[in-house]
Amino acid sequence: MNEEVSRPTRVALEIRKTLMEILHRDTKDPRLEKVNITECKISKDLSIATVYFTIIGVNEKDQPAQDAIKALEKAKGFFRSEIGKRMNLRITPEVRFFYDTVAENASHIEELIFKALHQKK
């Protein structure tokens, strides 16, 4: 099977990889130490990169997550600049950060299913 990955998908994967390198090697902000980039999606015209992140053991509403959001927003220009330097793109995409709630939602759904299955009839 010869499935070719689309250019936006390849660029999104490379941006995710690049951001992880930047976070782990080049940032000194302690609020970003435990941040993990879970996914990156990019618009078809490659102008906007939507980046999802999480911190293990932390919910979106917890203070460490809120601090990380503030730090990422403050440093988004730095991240964009570094992406531009490290990747050979005609246009460096705008970077938008969002806390990834998939794990939280999955945990909540599992809990609801467990309760429903073990409810006394």
UniProtKB/Swiss-Prot annotation:
One of its GO terms (molecular function) is ribosomal small subunit binding. GO terms for cellular component: cytosol. It comes from the Bacteria. It holds the Pfam family RBFA. Its main location: cytoplasm. InterPro entries: KH_dom-like_a/b (IPR015946), RbfA (IPR000238), RbfA_dom_sf (IPR023799), Ribosome-bd_factorA_CS (IPR020053). Keywords: Cytoplasm, Ribosome biogenesis. The keyword Lipid metabolism does not apply. GO terms for biological process: maturation of SSU-rRNA. It is found in: Cytoplasm. One of several proteins that assist in the late maturation steps of the functional core of the 30S ribosomal subunit. Associates with free 30S ribosomal subunits (but not with 30S subunits that are part of 70S ribosomes or polysomes). Required for efficient processing of 16S rRNA. May interact with the 5'-terminal helix region of 16S rRNA. Belongs to the RbfA family. Monomer. Binds 30S ribosomal subunits, but not 50S ribosomal subunits or 70S ribosomes. This is Ribosome-binding factor A. The gene is rbfA.
